[in-house]
């Protein structure tokens, strides 16, 4: 892996990230393909909307279809027919989400399969072994996502165990001779001093890139902004910075202004399937009756397949009738919109016009339909 920082505008960064399956232009948004598929999108559709890299979910792919199936395809790329880079998360967040179904110990996490109730055990070592089989370009360490809210004592205990798991992840990744990139994950809840301790510890261990975890887990926006603004500047300048699970278009712009390079979130795809569409001039809830006779495009400024071929009335009709095509067209648009935002930010940073671009984007988004 190689990361090249090409340009800065204020704190915003423009770079390239060279991985085994291609070169990524940053800042970048990564669509989420939990089960080896971005819901309602074909690999060709992902290419068409400009996706450079997508996510797979270690936890879910381990359970279904299982490693034997993916190993038979020599990894996730051939299995899902996506020859661009893939990042896989470690399974930590999914285990965290199981709540009462799991028990966290120093060794790892014991839990019951959400599919058949089978007793399972996931450790940093097993997570690294799974991700080696998946052959993802970027591997994430196994950590505990600190819940919100958490007291200082609770967050410290969680973060320090994640730090020990980070070392075990690093050791196993090396032992497996996995040549793909390994990213550390900063934890520490809403406590700046714990975030500082986490960054320092991860830097001592040594990782190819650094992620900020434990945000967008239910905390107020002000807390997320506070922790992001505090933590991002401390991350190594010469390594990619990844903000996990974020977020809205406005979140992306704010986070790029804080120095983040990489993002993922289910929001554009999940919202699309629920009829919540992002446009340049505000959000559209396509089920609303006001769109029944609307013969205009969803977003007059958008060049995606949906906006250049179909009316709001048609999208309204599809959604109201539960047609599969509705979810597909909505998802194409939302992901295209996110990719367009990222491309515009990259250009704005290149020409040192980011602040002006961000102000214009905010004006457009708040102007309404």
UniProtKB/Swiss-Prot annotation:
Asked if the Swiss-Prot or TrEMBL record annotates the protein with the keyword Aminoacyl-tRNA synthetase, the reply is no
Question: What Pfam families does this protein map onto?
Answer: TGT (PF01702)
This protein's pathway reads: tRNA modification; tRNA-queuosine biosynthesis
In the UniProt entry, which residues are flagged as the active site? 89 (proton acceptor), 264 (nucleophile)
Q: Which domain of life is it from?
A: Bacteria
* Top-level class of the enzyme under EC nomenclature: transferase
Q: Which reaction does it catalyse?
A: 7-aminomethyl-7-carbaguanine + guanosine(34) in tRNA = 7-aminomethyl-7-carbaguanosine(34) in tRNA + guanine
Q: Which residues bind substrate?
A: 89-93, 143, 187, 214
Name the record gives this protein: Queuine tRNA-ribosyltransferase
Give UniProt keywords alphabetically: Glycosyltransferase, Metal-binding, Queuosine biosynthesis, Transferase, tRNA processing, Zinc
Q: Which residues bind Zn(2+)?
A: 302, 304, 307, 333
What is the cofactor note?
Binds 1 zinc ion per subunit.
Q: Say which species the protein is native to.
A: Dechloromonas aromatica (strain RCB)
**GO cellular component annotations of the record:** cytosol
**GO MF, one annotated term:** tRNA-guanosine(34) queuine transglycosylase activity
Region annotated RNA binding sits at: 245-251, 269-273
One GO term under biological process is:
queuosine biosynthetic process
């Amino acid at each position: 892996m190689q990361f090249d920082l090409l340009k800065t505008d204020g704190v915003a960064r423009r770079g390239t990230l060279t991985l085994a399956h291609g070169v990524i232009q940053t800042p970048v948004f990564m669509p989420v393909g939990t089960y080896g598929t971005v819901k309602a999108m074909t690999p060709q559709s992902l290419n068409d909307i400009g996706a450079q890299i997508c996510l797979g979910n270690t936890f879910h792919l381990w359970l279904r279809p299982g490693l034997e199936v993916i190993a038979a395809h020599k990894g996730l790329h051939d299995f899902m027919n996506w020859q661009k880079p893939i990042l896989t998360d470690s399974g930590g967040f999914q285990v965290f989400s199981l709540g009462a179904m799991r028990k966290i110990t120093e060794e790892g996490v014991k839990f019951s399969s959400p599919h058949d109730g089978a007793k399972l055990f996931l450790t940093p070592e097993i997570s690294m072994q799974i991700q080696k089989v998946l052959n993802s370009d970027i591997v994430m360490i196994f950590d505990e996502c600190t819940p919100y809210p958490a007291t200082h004592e609770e967050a410290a205990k969680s973060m320090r165990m994640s730090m020990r798991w980070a070392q075990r992840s690093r050791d196993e990744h090396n032992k497996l001779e996995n040549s793909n990139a390994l990213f550390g994950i900063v934890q520490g809840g809403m406590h700046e001093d714990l975030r500082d301790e986490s960054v320092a510890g991860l830097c001592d261990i040594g990782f190819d890139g650094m992620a900020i975890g434990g945000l967008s887990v239910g905390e107020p926006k002000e807390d997320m902004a506070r922790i992001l603004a505090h933590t991002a500047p401390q991350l190594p300048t010469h390594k990619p910075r990844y903000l996990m699970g974020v977020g809205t278009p406005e979140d992306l712009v704010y986070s790029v202004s804080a120095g983040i390079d990489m993002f993922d979130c289910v929001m554009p795809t999940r919202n699309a399937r629920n009829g919540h569409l992002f446009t340049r001039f505000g959000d559209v809830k396509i089920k609303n009756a006001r769109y029944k006779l609307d013969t205009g495009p969803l977003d007059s400024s958008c060049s995606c397949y949906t906006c250049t071929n179909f009316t709001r009335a048609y999208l309204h009709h599809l959604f109201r009738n539960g047609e599969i095509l509705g979810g597909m067209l909505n998802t194409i648009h939302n992901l295209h919109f996110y990719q367009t935002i990222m491309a515009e930010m990259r250009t704005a940073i290149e020409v040192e016009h980011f602040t002006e671009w961000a102000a214009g984007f905010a004006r457009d988004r708040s102007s309404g339909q």
